[in-house]
């Protein structure tokens, strides 16, 4: 066959194959997406997306965000019409329950001690959270144990602020300055750069008289030194006293990018006697100081939050400070709902629960629905009615709006779906669903198997 004949033969073969392929039934072609969320209102502040659109997920990654993706292109389709589809929420103030040291506040064996205790990492999934940041539960001497016992096994992504105290959040040792070794702290952070995103200091010498072993700024200064050595931000849980003032902390001690958590706690003078917002907050923000909610069981007062929000001061990030002392009444969506009831728009709250905290911990790959990024997704619903919200002073605020999580997707897998959005109605379930297993045999397949 001549060269021209070979070319003609190849072209005819290609045309025949293309024509044949175009006539193959759709089911013979492999679906482009493993999962398709269809008809939801997508809010992705990182990409300035705020519209009704479909989200396609493939191989655990965001594969498409478009106004209309055919259902035939997906192996599984979930109708999320009337719901919000957002990046997975990020809770940057969380406390993990793990073995820890014998005196660790958050250790299971320490339940007899006064004080809060850590909670399971995956509890966060029920609030649309796909990333939690442990806020100093572990220090340099206990982080490896936390990693092996919790981080390595959690479905939710777990990152951490390393406590400047080597033993971690441990009541007595938190008051021991010799436990605060900036070099050891920085060395540990460098050893786990993919997991440890910053430093945490908390609870140091809040009441007792100062002495040579307990200088006022010891914990703050040593945490800052570790932050400088490791080039990471510091999160501050702080109690002001005459010798270490709030103004000095946020206007002099804290660096740009450092995080002041518990901003609406009772001890901070964020309001002047006349009720106006303390101008040092705006000054600190201009310096680059970050303000975080860190709600917790003792760090959120409506008497501070409501007037501040009305005057335009909204924390940069939402967070829970979740532990056994508050988990029965608190979650990430509950924190968001309180601010929603104060008049903060949902779109703004999603920004402060996704892209903002991602920037604070220097993880721009998180808190986004960008194509190619890991498919961490929250499906939320805004409810309207009569709701009561409580603060840590046992006071109530009434509201008429609330946000709840309806589905959580972590790395492309549905890990929370309490209403069965992704499930078949039981009457339409396949045959194996109705099969009773024989004694001693394997369990029957589920409706989606």
Positions of predicted regions on the chain:
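His/Asp/Glu-enriched, well-ordered alpha-helical/loop segment
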Residues: 303-384
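Active-site core of metal-dependent hydrolases
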Residues: 205-327
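Divalent metal-dependent hydrolysis catalytic cores, especially in the metallo-beta-lactamase
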Residues: 119-147, 155-172, 192-209, 231-235, ...
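C-terminal cap of metal-dependent C-N hydrolases
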Residues: 40, 374-428
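Divalent metal-coordination and catalytic microenvironments
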Residues: 40, 55, 60, 82, ...
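Histidine-rich, glycine-flanked metal-binding segment
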Residues: 30-35, 42-88
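Bacterial N-terminal signal peptides
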Residues: 8-23
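Metal-associated gating/positioning segment near the N- to mid-region
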Residues: 75, 80-152
